[in-house]
Amino acid sequence: MRSFYNKCFTNKLISAHSLFCQHVSTLKNNKKECFEDVKRSNRISDEFYSSFLYHSYIENLKSTKEYVYFIYLQDIYYNINIFKNKGRLYISNNGLCNDKLKDNNNNNNINSNNFGNSYNAYTKKKSFYHSFNDLNEAKEIRKKRKNEKSEKNIVEYLLCNIINPNENYHIQNIYNHNLNNNVSIEIHKKNDSVMYHYNNEKKTKTSKMTTDIKLKQINNVYIKYVPYKNKIITLACPNKYYPTLYRYFSSHTNKKEDAEENDKNKNININNVDNRYKEDFMYGCENKNDSEKHKKTTNNNFGDEFEKLKVKELDKILNKLEMLYDNKNNKMNINVKILGYIFKNFLLKNKELKRKIFCSLFFLLCSKMAIIYTPILLSTFIENVNLQKSLSNNIDIYSTNKSSVLLLCAYVFSRVLSSTMNELRNSVFSNISQKISTFVSKLFFYKIHNLNLTYILSKKNGELSFIFNRGCKSITNLLNVMVFQIIPIIIEFILYLYILTYKIHYTVSLVTCFNMFLYVLFTTLITKRRTIIRKHMNKAEQNTFNIFLDSIQNVEQVKYYTNEIHELKKFIKEQKKYEKEAINVQKSLSFLNFGQQIILNTNLFLCMYLTYLNIANDIFPFSYLILVNTLLFQLAMPLNMFGTIYRETKLSLVDIESMIKILVKKIKSPDYGNQMLIKNGNIKFENVYFKYPLNEDINGLEQNYQAKEKDPNIINNINNINNINNINNINNINSINNIYTFESNVKNISSTNMITSSINKLKKWYLDKVKDNKKNVQYNNNDVKKTNPNITKNLNKEIKENINTHLKNHKIINNSPNYNNNNYLFQNFTCNIENGEKVAIIGKSGSGKSSLIKLLLKFYEVNSGNIYIDNKNIDDIDLYTLRKNISVVPQDTILFNNTISYNIKYGNFQCTDKQMIQASIKAELHDKIMKMENKYDTIVGERGTKLSIGEKQRICIARCFLKDSKIIVLDEHASNLDNENKKAIEKALTKLCMGKTTFIITHVMENLKHMDKIIFFCGKNIYVGSHKNLMDDNHFYREYYDSKNNKML
């Protein structure tokens, strides 16, 4: 039974429960009994229930309006009718069949009126089901009975003598006589209509059954026959690649499996669960009628999703970015190069976007050409009107007015055309910029989830989200600035210069060029200063945001200790810093705008003056003043924004640089397409050495040291030692300040205690040197005499040696750690854990218990040694497979601010709703959920704050049931629970850990006697053994065990 159930539903052919719920809501309780109630009362098994629903799904033929099914369970026959158009489902007892069975078996316990014979009108009373295991079985029957003419079973006769599975048939009519073998069947082979008739000696009146079923070769076969002796043949291959042939459905199931199923389903009341999420959450299908998605298996679903998201393409792009970043020889700015590669890679694979870019540039050019002609048309119009006025007596007024009106219309049309082209450009390019931003967002989000856990945890709250938000916005802003502002300004400027040279005079163009150069130079210099001020403002803003976020996230702690005033003071302090920096930004903006206006108006004055001189000499007409004035004002409009453009571009590049630094970090991407399974769960730790990794900046410094490319700050500070006031005044405070400067620079490299202590020692050593040489230094109030050059040389040499020694202390030579270092948590740790063993991990807090599990999950990398799972080194197992086969129940479960059903399904989104509910029952959670107002649709709140600790732990356990991993980790799972919740959770965990390798991190001693192995962390030593062996042979464990028990007592 279980194998059939798994075959039907883990392959995602259909969710039986969801399909049933599409029909069950229309049943009338006073006439019909709910099919689920029949199932729950142990009169129907999962196998038949699944078969019924699966058939009703795959036989969804357009020409069929009604489906009739028969089920024989627990000595009772049932008939099921589904009316497709009306969406109704009827279930009734087959009274005639039950009476016949009662007479044959003399079973007085069978009640043929369980559901009322009055509903037999809705059913086809004499239909039975049976199936061969495969078509080969039918062929064997055909061989055996090929020459027999008197068949007792018409179905076997047809299979053996008439129906060829490799040809197409269409069964149109079946005439049923009674429970015996009196059957008439019409079979249409291709275009030939043949009537095959089989009669027993006893002839009765026939009745027509409404059956219309197709046979489609061997890849897609549906057959429905009327057999004898309570059976019918049903062969079905619903999927071309994964044929499923239904088995013979026995009326008796294994008692042990029945008992287990009864325990699972004892309290399910599906009618109380909202049907909406059953349909919407199933396999991520948006359309419940999307049969193709329902027919895919779990692995195929995931594989299609994997291909759809193009994860391999993302990995390829990220690897290329890492290579570009490592190539330091290229003279081009690395950030610009990486950004260019991302744009190029994205645009080359999107032909539609190429067309949109071309259209956008075309609209841009048309817009600028139109806006350039507006001042020319206006000037011509004024000149024409002026000419008309002066010569009104000598020319035809009508023709002159006509030309003026045409010029005026052309002027208005050019302005409208320019505006229209601008809007078309905006609408087309907005699609491009948003798609690129979405692409980069997907790339960054994928990268974040594959970064080293230590790096992510080292960041402040909200820092990564801040970088992500600003980086994505900056990409959109940069593209908009480039296309909507920088490129248009360049095009406009070139066109304006051409018109000024061609229409006016080259001197006007030269004056304009010179003033524009001054304008750009002034704007650039001021904006650089403003960028620094703006960075200070952004930093103050981010600090304010971090304080606000941290305070809100810890609001309970604030209220516990009544520190609301303290939090308010801290927030106001940072807010004032932000206020000060924001005022400075506004002041610098005002100064920038003032200087820009001075330059632009000076240029306007000079150009207008030169034009006036030419007009006064009768070289140009009067209208040229308007032409020059309009041209320069149109040029000034985008130039007024140049400072903002420059600043936004610089800030965008800064924000993008922060994002790029994360994108180019080297990672080992999990192979999401790999479906390899860990079968047993045997684990072996072999000579493992591990210590917590240094800060990543120090690691980078070590790499630079190995490559002999030391940090320039260090080199500058070392070289500056030669110039500590030219070593003329060792006592001078500037000398000591240089050491403090060196300390601050190194602290910028790392904030670790190791570095800080080393710098303090260096500072102390230096001051001691100062005191030792103080006696040798002679000075007065005006001059400072030079010290001995040997002292200078020795001092310089010793400082360099101290720095080099400090760096070498952190260096790993030939990838082999310094095993004498006392910072190692594990030294030569070895342990073998067999499949299904229960292993307790105990020891003092901070001794490395959780770190051992993080090594197993590859959150950290071992410094030396190997870890094996099923005799495979975890370095050779991709991260996806590794972590997919390990389930963790942490001490504090974090939930997403979503529904309970979403949080449970987070363990396996490919599960069905029925599997989710069964997991909730196993986790002792279902009853609590059903008491809630919205049941499985209840929102859990931020990080699950609306639920108790026990409820959150049970959700996590339900996730683990759905994940169904071979290795379970319980990390102090019951440390914060009361006794009642502990008992319920222990009961659920007993089911979860049955037959699986289990690690239990705990401080509770009462269960240690039942553990197969105990890993005991004692200082730098780790002891492994059973409870009895450790109690007998290890006095440290004995003392620890006794001390914990005494505390409990």
Curated annotation (Swiss-Prot):
Domain of life: Eukaryota
Matches recorded under Pfam families: ABC_membrane (PF00664), ABC_tran (PF00005)
TM stretches of this protein: 357-377, 397-419, 481-501, 506-526, 591-611, 619-639
UniProt transit peptide range: 1-90
SMART domains membership: AAA
Subcellular location as annotated: Mitochondrion membrane
Regulation: ATPase activity is stimulated by reduced glutathione.
Primary localization: mitochondrion
Annotated PROSITE patterns: ABC_TM1F, ABC_TRANSPORTER_2
UniProt-listed InterPro entries: AAA+_ATPase (IPR003593), ABC1_TM_dom (IPR011527), ABC1_TM_sf (IPR036640), ABC_transporter-like_ATP-bd (IPR003439), P-loop_NTPase (IPR027417), Type_1_exporter (IPR039421)
GO cellular component assignments: membrane; mitochondrial membrane
Boundaries of every ABC transporter domain copy: 807-1043
UniProt binding sites for ATP: G843, K844, S845, G846, S847, G848, K849, S850
Entry EC number(s): 7.-.-.-
Domain ABC transmembrane type-1: 360-651
Consequence of gene disruption: Conditional knockdown results in parasite growth delay during erythrocytic stages. Accumulation of organellar iron. No significant effects on parasitemia. No significant effects on mitochondrial morphology.
PANTHER family: ATP-BINDING CASSETTE SUB-FAMILY B, MITOCHONDRIAL POTASSIUM CHANNEL ATP-BINDING SUBUNIT
Assembly and oligomerization: Homodimer. Interacts with ISCU. Interacts with IscA2. Interacts with NBP35. Interacts with mHCF101.
Chain's role: Transports glutathione-coordinated [4Fe-4S] iron-sulfur clusters in an ATP-dependent manner. Required for optimal parasite growth during erythrocytic stages.
Official protein name in the record: ABC transporter ATM1
